[in-house]
């Protein structure tokens, strides 16, 4: 291994003439990254009540019946998934995927995750399982309003971004 020097740049480690890219590439935050493990990006714009919801959701999916998950999503078409991904920031739960809105899919996936956490049956000191971490997601689905919907509603009433920022810290 040797150190390469580029004018105006930090020194770069190189091995066999190849510039080391693993560190710079690890700073890119895509929705998921495949390394020696799969790293999933979780929710990063939520309050304390939802910080554990994302990880608990994924744990529930992995400890649940993966065949049920596969059955639910196996007929999804790649181009429709990409289209829903692109439309979701604007349309939220009204985004369509395979003829159903995202609220429909979110509800079904959340139920599968709950079953997985129930199967895992890891209890806290109060003898409650990890499904309690999904309560925030259940409220979002029950209210049919995303965090973005709530922020837009507050802004349309107040139009003070500082006030909205304080409310969501």
Model feature map: region roles:
Residues 1-166:
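C-terminal accessory/tail domains of diverse enzymes
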């Amino acid at each position: 291994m040797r150190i390469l020097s580029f004018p105006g740049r930090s020194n770069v480690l190189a091995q066999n003439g190849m510039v080391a890219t693993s560190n710079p590439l690890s700073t890119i935050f895509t929705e998921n990254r495949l390394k020696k493990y799969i790293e999933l990006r979780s929710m990063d714009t939520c309050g304390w009540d939802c910080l554990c919801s994302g990880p608990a959701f994924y744990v529930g999916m992995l400890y649940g019946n993966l065949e049920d998950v596969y059955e639910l999503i196996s007929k999804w078409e790649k181009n429709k998934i990409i289209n829903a991904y692109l439309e979701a920031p604007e349309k939220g739960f009204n985004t369509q995927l395979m003829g159903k809105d995202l609220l429909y899919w979110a509800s079904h996936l959340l139920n599968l995750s709950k079953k997985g956490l129930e199967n895992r049956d890891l209890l806290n000191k109060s003898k409650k399982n990890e499904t309690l971490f999904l309560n925030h997601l259940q409220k979002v689905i029950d209210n049919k309003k995303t965090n973005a919907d709530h922020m837009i509603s507050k802004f349309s009433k107040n139009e003070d971004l500082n006030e909205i920022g304080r409310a969501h810290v």
